[in-house]
Amino acid sequence: MAALVTSQLATSGTVLSVTDRFRRPGFQGLRPRNPADAALGMRTVGASAAPKQSRKPHRFDRRCLSMVVRATGSGGMNLVFVGAEMAPWSKTGGLGDVLGGLPAAMAANGHRVMVISPRYDQYKDAWDTSVISEIKVVDRYERVRYFHCYKRGVDRVFVDHPCFLEKVRGKTKEKIYGPDAGTDYEDNQQRFSLLCQAALEVPRILDLNNNPHFSGPYAMLCRAVPRRAGEDVVFVCNDWHTGLLACYLKSNYQSNGIYRTAKVAFCIHNISYQGRFSFDDFAQLNLPDRFKSSFDFIDGYDKPVEGRKINWMKAGILQADKVLTVSPYYAEELISGEARGCELDNIMRLTGITGIVNGMDVSEWDPIKDKFLTVNYDVTTALEGKALNKEALQAEVGLPVDRKVPLVAFIGRLEEQKGPDVMIAAIPEIVKEEDVQIVLLGTGKKKFERLLKSVEEKFPTKVRAVVRFNAPLAHQMMAGADVLAVTSRFEPCGLIQLQGMRYGTPCACASTGGLVDTIVEGKTGFHMGRLSVDCNVVEPADVKKVVTTLKRAVKVVGTPAYHEMVKNCMIQDLSWKGPAKNWEDVLLELGVEGSEPGIVGEEIAPLALENVAAP
């Protein structure tokens, strides 16, 4: 059975803002004095005095006007994504990448899009809206502020509170969920309950169009299109941290006539992290007893407590109007049984689940203009370009420089899911029998970092292990490697194989999740077969699969068949454009009033139109 962790370590022409009926006497700052607030379990503080900004007002030229109108020319949908991570501001894995890339692609298709995430750092490009809410958490009220920036056609809203900002300093990495890999913060329930409630307030109280301290496209947008109430919203929740949002929406808002037509889509990025806590903790969530059954859960684990528990992800699945995940094959795996569904398979068979493969940021990962590469290349120059980058990579890590020697790369978080222990167990047999070099890059659990260094010590002329965060080296490895090894025990979608294909590097991968949907045997890579999901042991059969597949891949390197694979990898469209259209089709099925299909567009990201906070 897969090891289970209690907490993750691992536009339209409408405006989502204060409704017209709030524009009356009694308006307090950017927020009305609303009698319903008492029922919502929160208090309005309104807008505090904002610091003066010396920046000149934004001037719109014809180019700006045409951009804004084109982006909002269709009815579209009002989409509010909510998640614990949002790249590039915060990221530990694929969740951050999705909330960084998918919303921008949806906005490019004419939908009005907002993303809400915690403010873990003092982001230089996010300005203080001066809007404050007091939200009930357990038995007290907590004050939150909202910061905002407008990037790539998307409103990025950051929830500011000490429980986020004071715990994470500098690069976030795994510190979002705990001080170290494998360790959670004790107050994670309170932190993410706060996030869910704060997120529900944003479309109601954050009037970006009329804020005098904002200078950006919204000044033009509010004139170009009619204002509309923020009722017809689709909230897109992501992983267990947002599992409470649908519950709060129903109990605190819809029961009081607010967000009457709003719907919730819940996306599972990794079923292994479910938010399991003591059943007694339900009382701390301030939810009616009628929701208890959605949380009630009994498993065979003794952590965090033995016996009856609450399960945030279970509640998120049951209370959502639509359940999605990040690849079709992963959706099949989740309902296949207890082992891969992590004891929620029966729930997902009941609700149904839709899988949509992720895209990737094709501007950040682009061999044509990648600043980290020794030689840039495209599909027509890939063979020579990759050979030159291989030589540079070999020299960089201290391996013998020889472009004729096949080079295998492994890049990933050093945790059980990614199977670094399986990869390391396979290396001795591979390097003893094949003329090959292997470069390993990753950080994570100390036991795996030690394993990586130990295998380098055993094979100093054939293996290099880099156990520190090194983004430039990751790019160099993508370009210089002949084969990318992905030994994941399970992989909901996977980004690494998409990045590899973007650089013309075929992938030798385990046959699980999104790897099945994205890697085609013999055309863009090599399949190992499915590996065991038991994270506590390294199965000999799994080691054999890795050895056999990598040997097979190494023998193909340099042949005409391999050259064709490089080409096949590079000619694919791996952007968010296709996935965004699939997401649109699914979300339209929710039938939210006023929702319409979007347009076929390109991302809106001219730097001159992006809102950047004053220094």
Swiss-Prot record:
Residues where ADP-alpha-D-glucose binds: K91
Q: Which Gene3D superfamilies match?
A: Glycogen Phosphorylase B (3.40.50.2000)
List, alphabetically, the NCBIfam families matched.
Answer: glgA (TIGR02095)
Q: Which family does it belong to?
A: Belongs to the glycosyltransferase 1 family. Bacterial/plant glycogen synthase subfamily.
The reply on keyword Endoplasmic reticulum is: no
EC number(s) of the enzyme? Answer: 2.4.1.242
HAMAP family the record matches: Glycogen_synth
**Where does this polypeptide localize?**
Plastid, Chloroplast; Plastid, Amyloplast
Record: transit peptide? 1-70
Sorted keywords for this record are: Amyloplast, Chloroplast, Glycosyltransferase, Plastid, Starch biosynthesis, Transferase, Transit peptide
Q: Per UniProt, what is the name of the gene that codes for the protein in this document?
A: WAXY
GO annotation (BP), single: starch biosynthetic process
In which broad location class does this protein mainly occur, judging by the first location in its UniProt entry?
Answer: plastid
Q: Which cysteines are joined by disulfide bonds?
A: none
The name of this protein is Granule-bound starch synthase 1, chloroplastic/amyloplastic
Task: Give the metabolic or biological pathway.
Answer: Glycan biosynthesis; starch biosynthesis
Q: What class of enzyme is it?
A: transferase
